[in-house]
């Protein structure tokens, strides 16, 4: 009876052992340190600042400190030692709640202070009585607890991780990288390419059957939405809208498109469920939940990489790094380490294909340089942080709107234009030119692969760490229908959120670029897009259902009508909602929940390009250009196809490549990222990645012939 396991060398078993040990240590680190709070660290954020020049602001700061100190003494916050971050957080919340109640009771008993104007003179009401400040201006705000608790817990830590960060860095990052390389390097001695070595039997890579996959996906999505209602506090408009739209999409796909009751392709053989894959996916999901929404519980991991972060900062800045807490250096360093180690694996596996080698090196380079080191260097060169001194912009220079969704936020624009040099203005115009000119031009020339498979960090992680799970992408028609609605829905959400952001940022005065002129430009662009779509549809160049076309036109007309309403009324909040709440919800749902928790956590459950396929708004934008105005296509030589199915199996975007190859039809799909793995795994050389401007509008035709004449030369004819 044939075995379902692959033979591994002693060196590879050693590598697996080292990796498992490093993962155990990495997880156990979170419980090794103790936590003891100091009065100074707790009270420091509540000291009166230079901007607190009004007497009642200084008095409020003093009251806050006094009542926090009393509450801390009552609860034992400053005397007890806590063994976990959870116990520390609970005590902090209890203490803060008591202090809030005491402060509120004080002002209710003693009365609120009198308000003053900009000159410091007391404000008076029309009836001659004194105008008082409002309670929210003097009470202890919830946001200060939320913003400071991770820093407080970090500063309270004492123990082996805090005192020996380098040791734990070597025992985790070092051992994991060494173990991974010991497992990967022997692959250079084996035959390159895929071996079809029981990928649907391996408990790590065989995926889940449809029922289990649906359960995991439903629980995760519902969990994120439920937490979103809590996360948004009392601003429930956008969570409610998202829930309603989600139900509409499900109804459209299952009932309007008659997908209910139809078979959908399982990721693996029937009744199989990869238990190691489930564990890996659960671990990834838990990591991203902690990273985005509960970073106070990963202070040990942050302490471990602090020496590296401080070393980079002090080397380039020439000054000592201010105390603070951020989990993002940890994430960036992990991201780069994983991409490098798994990038070596990618090169070992596809070393027979030069395209794959160059592509893998490219994404590693852009991640290490443009996404990690250059931003860290710019951060070190900052001279101020929302203060009087200007700050250098330090974001990822290769990120493009709408993937970089906060590019047009007011704090981002201020950071660009308020610098004394030209770097900020350059980066602002660079970002705008990339969106308007760079993206369409590059996609026209070579397809969306130039970004998704050669530059993007999200795609880079998917291609390296996610490569073992690329075969789990759902190739069913139902999945494709969900894909089209969801990814273009996210793109529309990004456009609306950005429009609201720009509208709120612009002045409402006589400048040439004000709110009214912006709405006019936005309306003209919408009308132009609808006109192009309708013309293309009439000429049969736009393959879209009538329902899809009607939905698109209805959206465009509705937005133009909304713009006219705001041009005539001049409201402050575009989309009838506070701009801050729109930004907060988009960052939570798309930036964290979709891109992180689902996008990466579901690698072992739904394949490595879940985010790129279903959620990335930039991929949707690139895909629209690729579908209708790109020279790129994957050509097929149908006569050579033996229907082995390798191409479809290893397509990470869920495209049934074999169906195209069997018909001899070139592959022109908006979702295709041009990774080229389908061509790399084809044993007959049926598939080729090519560019040509000869037949842009006829690339996807099923039947074409070559017409040769003296007058017209060589041309493709239907």
Summary of predicted features, one role per range:
Residues 1-665, 670, 677-680, 684-718:
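Non-ligating segments of multi-cofactor redox enzymes
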């Amino acid at each position: 009876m044939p075995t379902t396991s692959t033979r591994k060398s002693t060196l590879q078993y050693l590598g697996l052992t080292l990796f498992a040990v490093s993962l155990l240590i990495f997880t156990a680190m979170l419980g090794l340190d103790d936590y003891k709070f100091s009065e100074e660290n707790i009270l420091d954020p509540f000291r009166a600042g230079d901007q607190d020049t009004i007497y009642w602001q200084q008095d409020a700061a003093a009251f806050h400190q006094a009542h926090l100190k009393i509450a801390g003494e009552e609860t034992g916050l400053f005397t007890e030692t806590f063994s976990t971050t959870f116990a520390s957080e609970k005590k902090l919340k209890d203490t803060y709640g008591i202090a809030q109640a005491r402060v509120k009771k004080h002002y209710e008993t003693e009365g609120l202070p009198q308000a003053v104007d900009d000159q410091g003179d007391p404000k008076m009401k029309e009836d001659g009585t004194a105008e008082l400040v409002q309670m929210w201006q003097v009470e202890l705000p919830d946001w200060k607890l939320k913003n400071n608790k991770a820093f407080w817990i970090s500063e309270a830590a004492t123990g082996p991780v805090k005192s020996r960060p380098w040791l734990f860095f070597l025992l985790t990052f070092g051992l994991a990288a060494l173990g991974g390389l010991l497992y990967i390097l022997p692959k250079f001695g084996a035959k390159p390419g895929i071996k079809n070595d029981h990928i649907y039997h391996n408990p790590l890579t065989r995926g889940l059957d449809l029922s289990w996959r649906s359960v995991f996906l439903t629980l995760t999505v519902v969990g994120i939405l439920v937490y979103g209602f809590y996360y948004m506090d009392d601003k429930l408009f956008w969570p409610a809208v998202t829930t309603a739209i989600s139900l509409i999409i499900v109804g459209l796909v299952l009932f309007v498109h008659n997908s209910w009751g139809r078979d959908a392709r399982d990721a693996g053989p029937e009744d199989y469920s990869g238990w190691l894959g489930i564990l890996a996916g659960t671990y990834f999901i838990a990591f991203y939940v902690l990273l985005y929404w509960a970073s106070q519980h990963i202070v040990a991991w942050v302490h471990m990489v602090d020496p590296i972060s401080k070393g980079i900062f002090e080397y380039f800045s020439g000054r000592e790094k201010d105390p603070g807490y951020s989990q993002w250096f940890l994430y960036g360093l992990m991201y780069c380490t994983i991409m490098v180690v798994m990038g070596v694996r990618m090169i070992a596996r596809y070393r027979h294909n030069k395209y794959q080698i160059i592509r893998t090196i490219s994404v590693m380079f852009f991640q290490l340089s443009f996404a990690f080191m250059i931003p860290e260097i710019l951060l070190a060169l900052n001279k101020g942080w929302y203060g009087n001194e200007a700050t250098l912009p330090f974001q990822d220079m290769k990120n493009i709107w709408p993937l970089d969704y906060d590019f047009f936020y007011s704090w981002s624009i201020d950071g660009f234009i308020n610098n004394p040099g030209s770097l900020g203005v350059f980066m602002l115009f660079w970002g705008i030119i990339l969106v308007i000119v760079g993206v369409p031009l590059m996609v026209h020339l070579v397809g969306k692969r130039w970004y998704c498979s050669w530059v993007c960090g999200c795609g880079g992680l998917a291609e390296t760490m996610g490569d073992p799970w690329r075969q789990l992408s759902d190739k069913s028609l139902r999945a494709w229908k969900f894909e089209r609605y969801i990814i273009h829905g996210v793109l529309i959400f990004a456009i609306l959120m950005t429009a609201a952001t720009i509208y709120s940022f612009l002045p409402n005065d006589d400048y040439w670029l004000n709110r009214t002129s912006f709405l006019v430009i936005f309306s003209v662009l919408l009308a132009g897009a609808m006109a192009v779509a309708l013309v293309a549809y009439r000429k049969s160049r736009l393959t879209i259902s009538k329902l899809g076309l009607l939905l698109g036109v209805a959206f465009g007309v509705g937005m133009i009508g909304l713009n006219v309403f705001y041009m005539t009324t001049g409201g402050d909040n575009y989309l009838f909602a506070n701009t801050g709440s729109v930004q907060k919800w988009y960052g939570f749902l798309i930036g964290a929940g979709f891109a992180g928790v689902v996008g990466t956590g579901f690698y072992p459950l739904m394949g490595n390009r879940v985010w790129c396929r279903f959620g990335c708004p930039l991929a949707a934008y690139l895909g629209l250009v690729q579908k209708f105005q790109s020279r790129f296509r994957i050509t097929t030589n149908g006569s050579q196809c033996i229907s082995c199915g390798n191409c479809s199996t290893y397509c990470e975007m869920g495209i049934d490549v074999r169906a195209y190859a069997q018909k001899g039809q070139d592959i022109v799909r908006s979702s295709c990222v041009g990774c080229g793995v389908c061509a790399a795994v084809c044993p007959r050389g049926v598939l080729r990645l090519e560019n040509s401007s000869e037949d842009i509008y006829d690339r996807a035709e099923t039947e074409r012939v070559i017409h040769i004449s003296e007058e017209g030369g060589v041309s493709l004819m239907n």
